[in-house]
């Protein structure tokens, strides 16, 4: 898996979030009912709830894990009286979150992106003060370059993988901490099913770890990928961790397009009732446009992939729907605009 960031044994999420000098960089995102989506499930008498991580300060859920990891890396560097330099490869959203963390923590940051990332996304990352390097056509190639750069710069201990690190997963699991508290406080009911998108698997690991923490392993999970970014779906079909050929990575949704989920994602998934589903790029883009009309929240197609399962009512064919409380993770994303979505929709086959 390449270089790993070394974290001292005494590091823990509780210590970090309770330290005045290292506050978390994410917010508690709102849990909202979507009346528009609930209306689609009127016959089933079901409500659709949204965990809206699109409202995170970096634009996506990624800041949960990235903020935790960056805070800890900086703490480690300060203890050695050394200067930190965060280096991260990304399909866009992890890079934006690392750049945001670097700006807030006053740390030099370099983000390596593949050449398929929109210029608008690159500019947003630069606006956070990060140095941006464009290399390769897919994330895997950008990641190889980032690892080499970290070696060259002598800062391998500040290399940040976008989805494969225990502190990233721990940070992402705070999403479930908040959902559990919302249930305890009567904001919503315990979910009967949870839907979310899968790229490299970091968010999935965090969500499943959080569910495990509260004994919610009984909740069915629906994971969503697009055709052409379907590494977890393929692993599930073949009953082993599988890597896509480069020629199979054809989705235009680059923030989902990794050749394989990380090994921990595959291992932890075995302990849960998971139903992977594939949608088309067009489904995902179309869902983004519907969602911005319905909820006035703009998300990118990696998030729209999951929303499309609700808009198309494919969920009803996946479950024996006693699911009265459907929860979808609105994970967000920075790499789009309404104009881009409309333009992209015109290029995708019907």
From Swiss-Prot:
<dbReference type="GO" id="GO:0030170">
    <property type="term" value="F:pyridoxal phosphate binding"/>
</dbReference>
<keyword id="KW-0456">Lyase</keyword>
<comment type="pathway">
    <text>Carbohydrate biosynthesis; gluconeogenesis.</text>
</comment>
<dbReference type="Pfam" id="PF00291">
    <property type="entry name" value="PALP"/>
</dbReference>
<comment type="similarity">
    <text>Belongs to the serine/threonine dehydratase family.</text>
</comment>
<keyword id="KW-0663">Pyridoxal phosphate</keyword>
<dbReference type="GO" id="GO:0006565">
    <property type="term" value="P:L-serine catabolic process"/>
</dbReference>
<keyword id="KW-0963">Cytoplasm</keyword>
<dbReference type="InterPro" id="IPR036052">
    <property type="entry name" value="TrpB-like_PALP_sf"/>
</dbReference>
<feature type="modified residue" description="N6-(pyridoxal phosphate)lysine">
    <location>
        <position position="62"/>
    </location>
</feature>
<dbReference type="GO" id="GO:0006094">
    <property type="term" value="P:gluconeogenesis"/>
</dbReference>
<dbReference type="GO" id="GO:0003941">
    <property type="term" value="F:L-serine ammonia-lyase activity"/>
</dbReference>
<dbReference type="GO" id="GO:0005737">
    <property type="term" value="C:cytoplasm"/>
</dbReference>
<dbReference type="GO" id="GO:0004794">
    <property type="term" value="F:threonine deaminase activity"/>
</dbReference>
<dbReference type="InterPro" id="IPR050147">
    <property type="entry name" value="Ser/Thr_Dehydratase"/>
</dbReference>
<keyword id="KW-0312">Gluconeogenesis</keyword>
<protein>
    <recommendedName>
        <fullName>L-serine dehydratase</fullName>
        <ecNumber>4.3.1.17</ecNumber>
    </recommendedName>
</protein>
<dbReference type="InterPro" id="IPR000634">
    <property type="entry name" value="Ser/Thr_deHydtase_PyrdxlP-BS"/>
</dbReference>
<dbReference type="InterPro" id="IPR001926">
    <property type="entry name" value="TrpB-like_PALP"/>
</dbReference>
């Amino acid at each position: 898996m390449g270089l790993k960031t070394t974290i001292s044994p005494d590091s823990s999420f509780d210590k970090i979030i309770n330290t005045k000098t290292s506050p978390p960089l994410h917010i508690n995102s709102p849990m909202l009912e979507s009346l528009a989506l609930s209306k689609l499930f009127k016959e089933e008498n079901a409500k659709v709830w949204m965990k809206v991580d699109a409202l995170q300060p970096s634009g996506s859920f990624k800041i949960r894990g990235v903020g935790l990891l960056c805070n800890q890396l900086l703490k480690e560097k300060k203890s050695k009286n050394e200067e930190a330099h965060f280096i991260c490869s990304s399909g866009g959203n992890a890079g934006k979150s690392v750049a945001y963390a670097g700006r807030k923590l006053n740390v030099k940051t370099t983000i390596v992106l593949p050449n398929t990332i929109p210029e608008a996304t690159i500019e947003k990352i630069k606006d956070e003060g990060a140095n941006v390097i464009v290399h390769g056509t897919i994330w895997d190639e950008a990641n190889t370059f980032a690892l080499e750069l970290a070696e060259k710069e002598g800062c391998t201990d500040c290399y940040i993988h976008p989805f494969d690190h225990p502190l990233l997963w721990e940070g992402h699991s705070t999403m479930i901490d908040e959902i559990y508290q919302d249930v305890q406080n009567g904001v919503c009911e315990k979910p009967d099913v949870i839907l979310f998108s899968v790229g490299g698997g970091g968010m999935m690991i965090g969500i499943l770890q959080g569910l495990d923490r509260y004994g919610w392993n009984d909740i069915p999970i629906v994971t969503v990928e697009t055709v052409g970014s379907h590494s977890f779906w393929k692993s599930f079909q073949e009953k082993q961790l599988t890597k896509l050929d480069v020629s199979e990575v054809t989705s235009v949704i680059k923030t989902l397009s990794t050749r394989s989920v990380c090994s921990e994602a595959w291992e932890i998934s075995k302990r849960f009732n998971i139903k992977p589903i594939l949608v088309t790029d067009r489904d995902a883009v179309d869902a983004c446009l519907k969602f911005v009309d319905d909820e006035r929240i703009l998300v990118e197609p990696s998030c729209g992939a999951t929303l499309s399962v609700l808009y198309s009512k494919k969920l009803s064919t996946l479950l024996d729907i006693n699911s009265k409380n459907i929860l979808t993770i609105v994970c967000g994303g920075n790499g789009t605009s309404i104009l881009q979505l409309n333009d992209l929709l015109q290029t995708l086959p019907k």
